[in-house]
Amino acid sequence: MTDISRRGFLAAGTAMLAAQALPRIAMARPVPIPLIAGSRVLDIDGRAATVWGLTGPLGQGLSFDPGQRFEVNLRNDLPEPTIIHWHGQIPPNRQDGVPDMPMPPLNTGETRSYDYELMPGTYWMHAHIPMHEMRLLAAPLIVRSADDIAADRQEAVMFLHDFSFKPPQEVMEEIAGGHGETAAPQSGTTPQSGMNHAMTGGMKMDPGMMGQAGMPGMDGMPDMSKMAAMAMDLNDYDWDAYLANDRTLNDPDVIAVDPGGRVRLRIVNAAAATVFWIDTGALQARLVAVDGHAVQPLSGNRFGLSMAQRMDLEIDLPAGGGSWPVLALREGGRERTGIVLATAGAQVARLAPLADEAAPAFDTDLAQEGRLIAAAPLVARATQRQHMVMLGGSMTPYLWTINGRSW
C-alpha cells in the first residue's frame, strides 16, 4: 500500500473539489484552450448530415470571463486546409484569420497558437475560405463582462444557420446559374463567398424605393412594380433546413429557465445567405447590444438580423411557469427556426417549420438600424482621415467585392 501524508491527502481532495466546482473553460489556466476544426454528424429532421464545426472543451464554441485572454491552440482535423476568423474581435493582424493576409491556412493536422486581448460581447468564429462556412464551420465566441457576471440573469445563446444537404460547390453553381430559388421565388441576400460582410444585404434598390417600402405597420404605399421587383430579390437560394443551435423546429433546443427570471439571449446569424426576423412572440424584449457593443435599449418583439450580425435581447419572463418560443423567420419566406424557453415541467407545443405567411423584407427604410444609439458613443471630434470604399458585385459572375477584391 502506498502511504500518503495528511498534507498530500488534503491537497488531492482540494484539487478534486476545485475541478468539480469550476467546470467552465473561462477560469484561469496555465495552458492554452484547445479548439478543433473537425467534422461532426447532425440529425436534421431524421436525416444524418456530416458537417464541420469548431469544438472546444465544452462543445461547439468558446466562452470567456472578464480579464481572460484569447489563449487558444487551433488544430485542423479537416481533410483540407482552413483558417478561422475571430469575427468582431481585433487581434494582431497575423492572427486575424484571412487566408494569406499574412498567414496561410492551416494544413490538415497542423496546430496554430493564438494569444490576444479580448473585447467583451457576443462574437463568433468562422472559416474565411469559400465553401467552408457553408459546411457549418462556425461557432459562438462569447466574452462576458464584469457586469454580466454581477447581473441577476440567465444567459443563453441562439446560433443560426442555413443548411443544404448538397455539397457547397453544387449550391454555388446553382446560384450562379440562376437556379437557386426552387420553392419560394420571393427570395435577397447573398451567400458569403469569401465571407464579405461589408454589405448588409443583397437587395438591389434604386433611390426611389428608399422610404417607400416600410416595415409592417409603417405608413406609405410603395410603387407595386418596384415592390414586386424587390420581393423577387430577397433570397438567392432555398436551403433544405434552417437551424437554431443545430436543430430545426421539428426538434428544437429547449432551454430551461426560471419563472419570473431575466434572460440575456445572445443571437448570432451565422447563415450563409439568409436574413432573419427574430420574433419573441408573447414576450416583450429589449435590444441591448448589437455586434458585441451595448446600445440604448429598444423595446419590441420583432427585430431584424442580417448575415454575420449579432444581437443581445434581454427578456423578463412571466412569474408563472410556461414555455415561450423565440423564432427566427426567414426574410421573404415562410420558413422559420428557433428555440424554446421553458420552465420545469412546462408543456412545449409543437411548432410548424412553416409560418402561415411570408415574413417581410428587413429594414428597407432603416426603421430599426436608424434607431440604434451606442450606449457609449465615440467622442465627437473633427475628421482626420477619409477613405473611399467601393462596394461591387454581380450575379454573373457571382462575385462581391470591396475595392475590386473579394475577401
Where are the language model's segments positioned?
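Short edge beta-strand segments in beta-sheet-rich domains
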Residues: 30, 134-138, 151-155, 282, ...
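Non-cytosolic beta-sheet module surface loops
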Residues: 74-76, 118, 131, 268-271, ...
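Histidine- and aromatic-rich segments of cupredoxin/plastocyanin-like copper-binding domains
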Residues: 95-96, 104-106, 222-366, 375-380
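Acidic-aromatic/histidine active-site loop/patch
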Residues: 159-261, 268
